[in-house]
């Protein structure tokens, strides 16, 4: 029984999505998400933009840094785009030196 449930669980995550919007459609208000990248490299911007456009709120985000941003919003990058729209309620990071 355990193996079957584990297989079902894994199978549910083995979906190929054709768009970033499809990939994030299951993210609901209050979700916990993790994001990769550091500084300007390896950041999943297509997925983060899709999350931003979905208007989900109260996210808890785990990442090594909260992205980039400035007071005017001209340099927002990475998780900074979600911080700008106040979609992140709690941030768990190891480095926060570059964000506003």
Predicted feature locations:
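Conserved alpha/beta enzyme-core scaffold
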Residues: 2-100
